[in-house]
Regions:
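A short tyrosine-centered beta-strand micro-motif
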Residues: 86-92
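Acidic, glycine-anchored loop motifs typical of Ca2+
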Residues: 96-104
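A short, amphipathic beta-strand motif
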Residues: 29-37, 47
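Exposed aromatic-hydrophobic patches
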Residues: 76-82
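Bacterial N-terminal signal peptides
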Residues: 2-14
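Short proline/glycine- and polar residue-rich coil/turn motifs
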Residues: 68-74, 135-137
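Extracellular beta-sheet/turn segments enriched in Thr/Pro/Gly and aliphatic residues
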Residues: 21-23, 31-32, 113-150
């Protein structure tokens, strides 16, 4: 768990609000991400889009698009423009305290909610890349991501 969580933590710690759109408008394909399982409506939700390359997934500064949106409720919709149709992967985290960082305890365990595209189990390491990749079609593709909290209360 620590190795996979460490990679996820490292990748999410550098999220910035770049290349994101608040609404699914404009030309080209769009990705509508519905973030579920928030344990509260505090802070922000960060969504990162990665290319179809296992070596680049969660790698520092390899995101194709990043959104860092203020939460408006217990479910958040985030829209991203994607470069073209094809396969991608997503990571999401709940920046609960709004400090623009993915917080962890002294053992490296996330103290904020995390999720990946296709909602694979995150147990003792990151899932295989094939489990997180998904296809963006023409126009708009919708994907739902449920957050998981390793510490403290979860939404459920």
């Amino acid at each position: 768990m620590m190795c996979g969580l460490a990679a996820l933590c490292l990748a999410l710690s550098g999220a910035t609000a770049a290349a994101a759109q608040e609404k699914c408008v404009g030309d080209g394909p769009h990705l509508k991400v519905i973030v579920e399982g928030l344990r509260n409506a505090d802070g922000y939700v960060s969504v990162e889009l990665y290319p179809d390359d296992p070596k680049l997934f969660l790698a520092h500064n390899q995101q194709l698009a990043v959104a860092h949106d203020k939460l408006t409720g217990m479910e958040q919709v985030v829209c991203l423009s994607v470069p073209k149709t094809g396969y991608y992967a997503l990571s999401v985290y709940h920046d609960e305290n709004g400090d623009d960082q993915f917080n962890r305890n002294k053992f490296g365990i996330p103290t904020e909610g995390v999720g990946l595209s296709n909602n694979p189990k995150i147990m003792f390491g990151l899932p295989a890349f094939e489990k997180v990749r998904f296809k963006v079609a023409e126009a708009e593709t919708t994907i739902r991501i449920g957050l998981r909290y390793f510490l403290g209360k979860s939404a459920n």
